[in-house]
């Protein structure tokens, strides 16, 4: 298969790229790190799938730069949706669990608009909080593993491992288009308070801060649609953290 990945050098994109190359698929990369801007995107007509993951994803930064988030998350995605629709190419694009509280931030608004402008058959992937090797240094799970966290919050977060995310994407790609929903929550369906993971599971003694008003207090996914397809997550965040942080406390 010929698969285009935007954001192919990013966290999820790089994992997908390596998995699919190993399976013998032809991967077309489109990434700013390769000098390719989304506004200039060219999608070949013989492409089987476009996996659109390139986006600005920092909720806090979106408060400070709303116009930039509109340009990078809305204008570019709307264009990709149009091109894929006109060429008959199946599109899966990164939405976010933020759509459930979309009015709290420009980032959430941008993802809500992405879902509203999608054409029939195009699928939004409402990722919760993805973790694993290669995640941004600012992400909490990585900080806990590296013993770099200075505080925890009272947020409830649905942490999903990147390998489980990839399994969901592949499962949906293998479904007939007429059987797909417009969007799917992509998480484990299990929420954990961040301070519980940090202090009770990892054994730290971090101060606890209140969550910011522009962030959802709880992003636990409703994975009923995924479970209806017999999918269940394979990696549990509590087990993952216990394994990764045990050495820190020996």
Language model: regions and residue ranges:
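Conserved Rossmann-fold NAD(P)-dependent oxidoreductase catalytic core, especially the SDR/UDP-sugar
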Residues: 52, 78-108, 123
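NAD(P)H-binding glycine-rich loop region in Rossmannoid oxidoreductase-like domains
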Residues: 41-72
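Amphipathic terminal alpha-helices
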Residues: 224, 236-250
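Adenosine-cofactor binding site in Rossmann-like domains, unifying the SAM/SAH pocket
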Residues: 26-42
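N-terminal Rossmann NAD(P)H-binding glycine-rich loop of SDR-like oxidoreductase domains
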Residues: 3-23
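C-terminal "lid/loop" region of Rossmann-like NAD(P)-dependent oxidoreductases
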Residues: 181-185, 192-199, 203-223
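A recurrent short beta-strand within the Rossmann-like NAD(P)-dependent oxidoreductase core
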Residues: 129-130, 151-157, 169, 176-189, ...
């Amino acid at each position: 298969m010929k698969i285009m990945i935007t954001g192919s050098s990013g966290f999820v994109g790089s994992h997908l790229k390596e998995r699919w190359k190993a399976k013998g698929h032809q991967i077309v990369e489109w990434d700013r790190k390769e000098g390719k801007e989304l506004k200039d995107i060219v999608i070949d007509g013989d492409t089987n799938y476009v996996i659109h993951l390139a986006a600005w994803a920092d909720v806090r930064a979106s408060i400070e730069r709303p116009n930039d988030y509109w340009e990078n998350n809305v204008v570019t995605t709307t264009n990709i949706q149009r091109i894929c629709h006109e060429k008959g190419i199946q599109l899966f694009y990164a939405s976010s669990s933020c759509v459930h509280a979309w009015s709290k931030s420009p980032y959430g608004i941008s993802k809500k608009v992405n879902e509203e402008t999608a054409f029939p058959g195009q699928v939004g992937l409402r990722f919760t909080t993805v973790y694993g090797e290669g995640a941004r240094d600012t992400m909490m799970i990585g900080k806990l593993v590296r013993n770099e966290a200075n505080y925890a919050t009272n947020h409830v977060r649905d942490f999903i491992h990147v390998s489980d995310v990839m399994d969901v994407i592949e499962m949906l790609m293998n479904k007939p288009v007429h059987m797909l929903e417009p969007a799917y929550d992509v998480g484990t369906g299990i929420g954990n308070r961040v301070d519980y993971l940090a202090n009770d599971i990892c054994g730290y003694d971090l101060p606890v801060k209140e969550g910011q008003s522009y962030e959802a207090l709880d992003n636990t996914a409703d994975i009923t649609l995924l479970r209806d397809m017999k999918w269940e997550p394979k990696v549990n965040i509590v087990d993952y953290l216990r394994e990764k942080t045990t050495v820190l406390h020996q």
